[in-house]
Regions:
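S-adenosyl-L-methionine-dependent methyltransferase catalytic core, i.e., the SAM/SAH-binding region
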Residues: 1-307
């Protein structure tokens, strides 16, 4: 079986779950099963649940994890929707890798790559909204909003204007064409491709990625898991900021108003602790093998046993 994707921070992810008890491990972003297979191998007492919205990834992982079929079950859907509905107990570990898989990036027909002849970017091929819809149907103001807020594109107004101007004559039908628009208005020669942040913004909009992460964090907070480890891998500042801020909230003992003269709460409102003070990043050795791991940041959190 040819493996189409190298899991990032594999050793670091596996190590983050050391000491978890018997129970269910949930891989919220199953992808091509790299992290899940190693977890099943290293932790023989866990049961596995895999979630993904990509049919191709689910089929591949079903085959790849077949030797563990008696310990594994797979669900299609978004993790923000499925995790809150799981009845399996106890859940002792949750993993989410928010990155786009190498196969999704490399398969031209998926429309994620700069030189794709299609304009799609859907992680779930059955979803209604695609990059084509965003680029050709959104107002200039809405395009400005997503380019600014989801891509942090400095010249977001200029890029939005260029898109609207280009589609006025004929629809923008390929990622390749969209890339050329970016190249025509954005400076070149930087560390990343000029179209990178524009593509990021559109992909986030198409797949509701930030809303999904918020939904996952809400589910983790509201389900009152006990002695559970959560490991989350982000790939850009917007994702990492959401995770970092939520972990900070979860470790806060005092919830009194910042202007209060004295503390009137019980000062025991923390629900766990972060397992490292800073995010874990790829080693030099991993970067040589898998350059796409350069942006990956792993943050882990352990909920209190008496929560």
């Amino acid at each position: 079986m040819k493996i189409p994707h190298i899991p990032v921070l594999l050793k670091e992810v596996i190590d983050s779950f050391k000491g978890v008890g018997d129970g269910y491990f949930v891989d919220c972003t199953l992808g091509y099963g790299g992290h899940s297979k190693e977890m099943l191998k290293q932790y023989p007492n866990i049961q596995h649940i895999g979630i993904d919205r990509d049919d191709e990834a689910l089929e591949f992982s079903k085959d790849r994890l077949s030797q563990y079929s008696h310990r594994s079950r797979l669900y299609k859907g978004t993790f923000a929707n499925i995790l809150p509905t799981l009845e399996e107990s106890p859940i002792v570990g949750v993993l989410a890798d928010f990155g786009v898989s190498s196969l999704q990036l490399d398969k031209k027909e998926r429309g994620f790559a700069f030189d794709s002849d299609t304009l799609d970017m859907r992680m779930d091929a059955s979803a209604k909204l695609s990059a084509y819809n965003v680029v050709n149907e959104y107002s200039k103001e809405r395009l400005e909003y997503i380019l600014d807020n989801y891509g942090e594109v400095r010249a977001y107004k200029r890029v939005a204007s260029a898109i609207v101007e280009a589609r006025a004559s004929s629809p923008i039908s390929s990622a390749k064409e969209l890339t050329q628009i970016a190249l025509s208005v954005l400076p070149q020669g930087g560390k990343i491709h000029p179209a990178t942040l524009m593509f990021q913004a559109i992909r986030i909009e198409v797949n509701s990625e930030l809303q999904e992460i918020e939904g996952l964090l809400d589910a983790l907070e509201n389900r009152h898991y006990k002695d559970e480890v959560v490991s989350l891998i982000s790939f850009h500042s917007l994702e990492d900021r959401l995770v970092k801020n939520r972990f900070k909230k979860w470790t806060k003992k005092c919830i009194c108003d910042s202007h209060a003269i004295r503390c009137t709460c019980s000062r025991d409102n923390d629900i766990g602790k972060a397992l490292s003070s800073k995010p874990i990043v790829a080693s030099k050795e991993e970067l040589k093998i898998n350059p796409r791991s350069r942006s990956a940041k792993l943050r882990s959190f352990r909920f209190n046993a008496n929560r």
